[in-house]
Amino acid sequence: MAFECDKSGATYDDALMKLRLFTALALTFTLITPATASHNFIVGGDRPVTVHLPDTLANPAPLLILLHSASTSGARLESYMKIAPVAKSQGLIYIAPDGNTNAEGKRFWNASKSCCNRYSQEVDDVAYIDALIDEISAKTPVDPKRIYLIGHSNGAFMSFTYACKTDKVAAIVAIAGAMDQNPECAPTTPVSLLNIHGTADKVIKLNGGVMNNNSYTSATNTVNTFISVNRCAQATALKKDFDPIITGAETTIYDYVCGTHAELQFWKIKDGAHKPNLPSDFAQLVISFLLKQSK
C-alpha cells in the first residue's frame, strides 16, 4: 500500500522521521545546556533543609553545604557569612542544614569525641549528610566530583570528619575548627582545604586543647593531616589584610605545593578571634577557591 504524498513529494514516513530527529535533537540540547533553575525544594525528613537552586542550573551542578557551629543554626551562619547570594549567582546548589538538638535544646554536629556531642547522643551525622546528598541528587543534577563543605567551629570539625570518612568531598573551607588527636583520615582521593584560624581564638585554640575530656589537634597538625592526604611540600607565605577590623596585613597565607591536583592553604589571622571579622568579599573569596577544585 503506497503512502500519499503532499505537494512537495514528502511521504508520511519522511515526516515521521523528521519529527523523531527533531525530538532527539531537542532532548540532547536540553541535557547539555544549562537551564534556568526551577523553584527551591525541601529535603531532610525530620531535619528539613531548603535546597537553594542557582540562577542557572548546569547539568550537573556543584553542591555546597554550609555547616554551622554548636548552639547556632544554618540560618545564623548564613547571616554571618552571606554565602547564599554568591552561590546563587555562581551556579552552586546550596544548603545550610541544622544539626540535632541536645538536652539543652542547642544544636550540634556529632563530629568527633571532642566536639561537640556533650550528652553522648546516638547521632550519625555522616549518614545524615550522605542522605541529604543522595536526596538532592535524586531531584536535581548534582556533580559528584564537585561537592564542597564550608564549616565554622563545630561545623568545621564536622567537615573534616565527613571528608575523612567518605570519598565525596572535593574541597573544604574550615574556619576555627580542628580534629581529634591522631585522627583516622584516609580518603582515597585528594581533598583540597582552605583552613582559617585566629591566633586569639579562645574557643578552639590555635595550638590545640581539650573539650569533652578529649584532646583536639592544633591548627598546624590539622593542616599536616591534609599535607599527608594530598602529598604536599613546603609552603610559600604571603601577607594579606583579611580582617577589616584588625589594622594592617594581619593574615599570613601559607600556600602549599601538592603532589596531587588538590590545593592546600592555611590562613593564620594574627589576633583573630573564634568568630573573625569577615571582609565584604568573603563569600566570593571562598567560593572562588572551591570552584577551582574537583575530584
Where are these regions (language model features)?
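The conserved beta1-alpha1 loop
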Residues: I65-S71, A176, H197-G198, K270
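Primarily recognizes the serine-hydrolase "nucleophile elbow" in alpha/beta-hydrolase
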Residues: S137-P190, K202
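Sec/Tat signal peptide C-region and signal peptidase I cleavage site
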Residues: I32-A37
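Serine-hydrolase catalytic machinery in alpha/beta-hydrolase-like enzymes
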Residues: N40-Y148, M158-T161, S280-A283
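Acidic beta-to-alpha connecting loop that harbors the catalytic carboxylate
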Residues: G99, T199-K202, G209-V210, K270-A273
